Structure formats: structure tokens, C-alpha cells
């Protein structure tokens, strides 16, 4: 500790933010009420299915109990807890997923929820699994499965088994991860036929419980391989006889086959806990840099408490706030060395530290921007949260420099969109927005996006949004999050303005159209709120305001755990570009 490169660039960077003058009790109450609603939905989803006690009576641990024993205390960062895009009755896609440290290393962990249909594949699960492999690929960290999967839920097989991003796609992704040198480690429990079998066999290392099995098909499938096309009494009796027989024999693919004969299973354990210890053992064999190798400063907590965010981030999106106060509560010692401060004033870009590790930060500024943007008439007033020419140019430069210097990026998004109109078109905003997407796509660095409040229009994409599948490791929202292509009033006006004009000209009653407009406005509001954002996967988790820093830490430490490429500190350009602008341009 204490021996760091280029301390005059990276230590004692400018501090930002101010102490909270007065708590906003009403705002805090509103935000915490929404957080509590999310907590309750999570509780209901986790408790759905068999009771924990009933699972334990069978000699099994639940998915959450297995994760608790696998992951280091305090390191679990849940992801996609409420993800349920097709409305499964149990409120989830029957897996538990997140980032956590296993034997000192950050891993993406996915556990079959054995409380629900014995961990079956259900609608939406494949997409959630693909997001897990996306996160592992982007962060270059191991993917760990705690598998207990009974295969496809047959009565909804058309929503689970086929399709381009369907039940088989995660097996191709596991192959891709192996080819990229990203290990996939699985611990298997219980019966895993068909989709469960391929889920078992596709990882790098297979560790099994002594009662586990994995197979192309289970006993039930074997019994129905020569169907008549219908079920009659004779066939029903044959099925019943088969069940009686197989109940007394081992299902296909048990340990005596895949450990003793094929050798597919690397190790077998007699206890539930033994399998988890086996996973830890193999994770322990994997490469990892000591974080001290990449540190530029001693780890420090932010200078201000995270609880201040409940007063500083208004739930009412018509109210502005100081983004520097947010940054000050997320990064080490509330330090930020800003890139091109004053240019593109609608955006903050700069270098910050997370537990002593460098990250790039990009965030929207709120409030009025006087005499801006420059391409409009003199005396124009820009609106914070909107993107203009200078801000887009600055972000393109910043992302490109972060990519060159191999620095992960944290995006803090609260945007109403990109400026519109002929002035904006002449200022090339359409092209500059796509330029930023190009810069992000070519960066090949891990990025993490927080939708602090609003994610709107194309700005939601270009500000490091989750649409960047190859760069966005994951994204989170808050109790204040609202994601929609535009606000409801704008949508209603765009959709019904001509109808209003036409009806008024014809002397018709406008009230029916007014009612439709108000219904659309309400629908936009309802469908853009945190609950729906979580269920549809518009963000990967709704996170309490005072827990955002924990996700920033997990992302940053994971990104530096085993990076694909490195830029030596003394060869970086971004910190020097910041210094040059401050010294020779700004003055």
C-alpha cells in the first residue's frame, strides 16, 4: 500500500459535492416507499413455490441458501431478481442471479430456483441466462452455475425451447465463453434431463452431488419416445407401469455413469455443502490480479454519506439537482478530475476512483444552461438532461480516451433526450449521437449504467445504455427511475394532435379524444416506473439509493480482476489531456 504510479495525476484530485444542508423528509419518504414496494415484490417472488422448510426436509438447500454458503458475506449484488417479461405466476424466471465473490474472486452466479417446478426452464429464463453470460463476457470473470434443473416446462415449451435467443442459446454462449478463456463452472444437484442435461454438460468443469444426474432425456421422456399420437387406456396403463418400474431404478445419467464411466463429472460430493466447496476450490485455481496492481491510491469511502441521496435526488423529475452531489456520494473521497469542464456543460465527464481503482465517469447535468447551445440564437437557454452538440463531441472524445487507456466507465443517466429541430440537425446531432454509439461499440471496455431518474429517447441508448450488448456489463435503476421513448404528454400529442384538429374543424366533441390522450399518458407513466422496468428487464435491478455504491464497487473490482488488456499508467493520455485543457485551453 502506498507505492503508486503518477501520484500528481491520480492522488488528491479535486473534491466535488457539498454537505447536505437540510434533509428533504418528504422526498425521502416517497423514495423509500417505492423501495419498500420493490422489496415486497422481491420477497414474494423468492417465497413463491415450495416452502423453504419443505425443500430442506428433502435434504436439499434452496437456491438462496446455496448462494449464501457459496458467496462471501457482504459481496452479493443481486441482478434480475424481478425479471419476468412473460408474466410467470411465481413472479420470476425461476433462477437466482447476481455478482458475488467466490473464494476471493468476483463471479457471475446463477442458481436454479429449486422451490419452483424443480428448477424447470420457464418463459424468460433463457434471456436471463444470456444476460448472465453477457456480464461474464464483458467483465471477463467466471460464470458459476448452481444447477438443479428439471428441464423445460412442457406446457409452455413454445416459449422456452426454440427461438434465436431460446433454451439452447445459453449452451452456445457457454461454448463461446470457454473459447474466450472465461471458465464456466457448474455444481449440479438433483435430476437434470434434456435442457437440464445440456445445461450440465456445457460448462468447463462439472462438480456433482452424489444423487445428481444429467442426461439427454429423463425416464419420462424415454417412456414416450414411440407415441401413438394420442393417449388411450392401454397407453395410460403402460405409462403407469413405466413409472412404477423407474421409481425403483436410478434415472439415466447418474453418478455411476458420468463419474465412474464417462468421467464427465470432475468431482462428486456426498453433501450439499461439499459441492459448493468444490466450486470454491476450482474458482480458487483461476487467474486474478491483486487489485493493488492496478490501484492509483489507497481505497477511501466517499466523503459524504450515501443516505444524503434520498434528499438530493428529487422523485419529481421537474426538479433539478446538483449532479456533483451525487458523484460525491459514489466515488472515493468524493474526488473527480473533470475532462473539459465548461465545454459541453450538459455533461460531466472525468476520472474518479473506486477503492483506489480508476474509472471514467459520465453523467447528465440538471438545471438551466444559460446562453447555450452555441448553435441557437443568442441568449438561448439549454435544459439540463438534454444532449447538445458540445456534450456529444465531448463524450465521444472521453469514451475514446477511456478505451485507449483501458479504463472502465460508469454512466449516470438522467436524460430527456437529444435536442431536436432544424438547428439541431444542422449541428449534426443525429450523426454525433450515432458517433457516440460507434465509440462505445469500438471501445471494448466494460461499462456500467445507472438510470438515476429518466432514460428517454435515443439518449438512453447513447449514454451507455443496456442496448450496448458487447460493452454494457449490466445496468441498474432506482426508485426514481422512469424509462420511456418520450414522456406521455409528448406521445399523446404526437398521436392525437391531427385528430384533435380534424374533429374541431368538423365540430365534433373533443372529449373522447382527450380521454384517449389522458389514458395514454397514464399508461406511459405506469409502464415506465421501477416495477415494470425490473420485470421487463429495462434495467437489471432496482437498487436502493444508499446501495448504489456497492454495485459500483462490484463492477469496478470485477472489471480489474482479470482484464483482457492493460495500459500502463505512465502511458495513459486521458489524465494528461485533462491537465493540458486546464493549463492551456480553459485559461
UniProtKB/Swiss-Prot annotation:
Pathway: Amino-acid degradation; L-glutamate degradation via hydroxyglutarate pathway; crotonoyl-CoA from L-glutamate: step 5/5. Keywords: Biotin, Decarboxylase, Ion transport, Lyase, Sodium, Sodium transport, Translocase, Transport. It holds the Pfam family Carboxyl_trans. Residues 31-298 form the CoA carboxyltransferase N-terminal domain. One of its GO terms (cellular component) is methylcrotonoyl-CoA carboxylase complex. GO terms for biological process: glutamate catabolic process via 2-hydroxyglutarate; L-leucine catabolic process; sodium ion transport. GO terms for molecular function: glutaconyl-CoA decarboxylase activity; methylcrotonoyl-CoA carboxylase activity. Its EC number is 7.2.4.5. Residues 295-558 form the CoA carboxyltransferase C-terminal domain. The keyword Ion transport applies. It catalyses: (2E)-glutaconyl-CoA + Na(+)(in) + H(+) = (2E)-butenoyl-CoA + Na(+)(out) + CO2. Residues 31-558 are annotated as: Carboxyltransferase. Decarboxylase subunit of the primary sodium pump glutaconyl-CoA decarboxylase (GCD). Heterooctamer consisting of two alpha, two beta, two gamma and two delta subunits. This is Glutaconyl-CoA decarboxylase subunit alpha. It comes from Acidaminococcus fermentans (strain ATCC 25085 / DSM 20731 / CCUG 9996 / CIP 106432 / VR4).
Amino acid at each position: 500500500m502506498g507505492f503508486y504510479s503518477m501520484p500528481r495525476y491520480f492522488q488528491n484530485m479535486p473534491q466535488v459535492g457539498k454537505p447536505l444542508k437540510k434533509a428533504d423528509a418528504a422526498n425521502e419518504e416517497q423514495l423509500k416507499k417505492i423501495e419498500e414496494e420493490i422489496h415486497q415484490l422481491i420477497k414474494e417472488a423468492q417465497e413463491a413455490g415450495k416452502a423453504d422448510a419443505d425443500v430442506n426436509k428433502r435434504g436439499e438447500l434452496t437456491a438462496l441458501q446455496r448462494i449464501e454458503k457459496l458467496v462471501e458475506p457482504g459481496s452479493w449484488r443481486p441482478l434480475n431478481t424481478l425479471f419476468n417479461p412473460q408474466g410467470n405466476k411465481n413472479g420470476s424466471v425461476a433462477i437466482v442471479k447476481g455478482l458475488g465473490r467466490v473464494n476471493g474472486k468476483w463471479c457471475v452466479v446463477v442458481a436454479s430456483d429449486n422451490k419452483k417446478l424443480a428448477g424447470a426452464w420457464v418463459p424468460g429464463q433463457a434471456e436471463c441466462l444470456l444476460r448472465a453470460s453477457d456480464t461474464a463476457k464483458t467483465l471477463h470473470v467466471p460464470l458459476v452455475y448452481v444447477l438443479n434443473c428439471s428441464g423445460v416446462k412442457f406446457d409452455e415449451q413454445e416459449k422456452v425451447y426454440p427461438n434465436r435467443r431460446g433454451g439452447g442459446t445459453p449452451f452456445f454462449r457457454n461454448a463461446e465463453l470457454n473459447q474466450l478463456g472465461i471458465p464456466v463452472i457448474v455444481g449440479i444437484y438433483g435430476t437434470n434431463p434434456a435442457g437440464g442435461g445440456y445445461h450440465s454438460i456445457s460448462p468447463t468443469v462439472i462438480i456433482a452431488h452424489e444423487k445428481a444426474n444429467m442426461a439427454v432425456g429423463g425416464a419420462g421422456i424415454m417412456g414416450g419416445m414411440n407415441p401413438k399420437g394420442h393417449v388411450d387406456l392401454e397407453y395410460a396403463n403402460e405409462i403407469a407401469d413405466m413409472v412404477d418400474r423407474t421409481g425403483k431404478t436410478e434415472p439415466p445419467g447418474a453418478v455411476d455413469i458420468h463419474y465412474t464411466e464417462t468421467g464427465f463429472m470432475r468431482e462428486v460430493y456426498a453433501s450439499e455443502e461439499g459441492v459448493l466447496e468444490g466450486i470454491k476450490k476450482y474458482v480458487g485455481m483461476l487467474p486474478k490480479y491483486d487489485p493493488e496492481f492496478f490501484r492509483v491510491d489507497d481505497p477511501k469511502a466517499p466523503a459524504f454519506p450515501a443516505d444524503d441521496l434520498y434528499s438530493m435526488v428529487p422523485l419529481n423529475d421537474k426538479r433539478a439537482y446538483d449532479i456533483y452531489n451525487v458523484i460525491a456520494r459514489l466515488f472515493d473521497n468524493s474526488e473527480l478530475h473533470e475532462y473539459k469542464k465548461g465545454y459541453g456543460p450538459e455533461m460531466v465527464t472525468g476520472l474518479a476512483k473506486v477503492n483506489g481503482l480508476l474509472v471514467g465517469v459520465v453523467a447528465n447535468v440538471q438545471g438551466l444552461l444559460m446562453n447555450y447551445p452555441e448553435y441557437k440564437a443568442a441568449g438561448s437557454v439549454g435544459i439540463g438532461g438534454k444532449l447538445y452538440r458540445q456534450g456529444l463531441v465531448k463524450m465521444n472524445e472521453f469514451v475514446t480516451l477511456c478505451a485507449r487507456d483501458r479504463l472502465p466507465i460508469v454512466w449516470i443517466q438522467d436524460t430527456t433526450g437529444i435536442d431536436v429541430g432544424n438547428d439541431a440537425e444542422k449541428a449534426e446531432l443525429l450523426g454525433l449521437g450515432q458517433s457516440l454509439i460507434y465509440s462505445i461499440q469500438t471501445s471494448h471496455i466494460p461499462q456500467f449504467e445507472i438510470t438515476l431518474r429518466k432514460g428517454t429517447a435515443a439518449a438512453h441508448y447513447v449514454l451507455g445504455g443496456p442496448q450496448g450488448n458487447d460493452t454494457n456489463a449490466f445496468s441498474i435503476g432506482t426508485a426514481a427511475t422512469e424509462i420511456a421513448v418520450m414522456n406521455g404528454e409528448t406521445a399523446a400529442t404526437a398521436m392525437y394532435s391531427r385528430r384533435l384538429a380534424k374533429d374541431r374543424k368538423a365540430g365534433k366533441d373533443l372529449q373522447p379524444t382527450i380521454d384517449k390522450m389522458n389514458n395514454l399518458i397514464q399508461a406511459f407513466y405506469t409502464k415506465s416506473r421501477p416495477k415494470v422496468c425490473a420485470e421487463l428487464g429495462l434495467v437489471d435491478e432496482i437498487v436502493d439509493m444508499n446501495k448504489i455504491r456497492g454495485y459500483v464497487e462490484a463492477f469496478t473490482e470485477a472489471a480489474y480482476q482479470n482484464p483482457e488488456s492493460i495500459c500502463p499508467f505512465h502511458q495513459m493520455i486521458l489524465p494528461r489531456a485533462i491537465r493540458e485543457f486546464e493549463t492551456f485551453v480553459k485559461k
